[in-house]
A protein has these predicted regions:
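Segments that shape or occlude catalytic/ligand-binding pockets
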Residues: 1
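A gly/proline- and charged-residue-enriched helix-loop-helix capping module
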Residues: 10-48
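Active-site loop segments of alpha/beta catalytic cores
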Residues: 34-177
């Protein structure tokens, strides 16, 4: 639903404009359509590469990165302060769609699924907001994502997400032999 500037040889893809000015508008956006457009072409490319014996790493963006294309960040921060119950619904609306996408990536043969939300780091959100998001969304969301991991599919987490989970004691480092 976002307006995307695909970029050029100097700068890559980025938001071209916002489609929402209030966080409640996000709840009225249609679900992602995985059956057409670039998203479908990417899934088909994944399938073809796996059929040819290649390993496929699929990067999946988290809710803050997606929101960064849909709405100005100041409205997101305002919503988190003044409308936390709406923001929880927004996170889960996006989270459910992200999870569906990850399920499709697995179905199409993606064997490494990388989850990153660079716009949702502690350096942007601050420690208090980061902790709230990690406890109320990121951790429960990733518990659902964890179900996708098996002997054919590995889930990779970006360092910011990993450190947020460790910092809130929702995860710990474990040595594997």
């Amino acid at each position: 639903g976002g307006i995307i500037n695909l970029g050029n040889e100097i700068a890559g893809p980025r938001a071209g404009g916002y489609v929402c000015t209030d966080v409640e508008e996000i709840l009225n956006l249609p679900d992602m359509d995985f059956t057409k457009g670039r998203i479908q072409e990417t899934l088909l490319a994944c399938k073809k590469l796996r059929e040819e014996g290649e390993h496929v790493v699929f990067e999946v963006a988290g809710p803050f990165t997606i929101l960064n294309v849909l709405i100005d960040a100041r409205y997101v921060f305002k919503g988190m302060r003044k409308k936390p119950e709406v923001m929880e619904k927004v996170f889960w609306k996006l989270g459910d769609q992200i999870l569906k996408y990850m399920e499709l990536v697995k179905e199409y043969g993606g064997d490494l699924i990388s989850y990153a939300d660079s716009s949702g780091g502690v350096n942007i959100l601050g420690p208090k907001m980061m902790e709230a998001v990690t406890v109320n969304f990121t951790y429960p969301f990733l518990k659902k994502v964890e179900q996708l991991a098996d002997d054919k599919t590995m889930i990779l987490l970006c360092p910011k997400t990993t450190l947020a989970l460790i910092g809130t004691e929702k995860a710990k480092f474990v040595d594997h032999q």
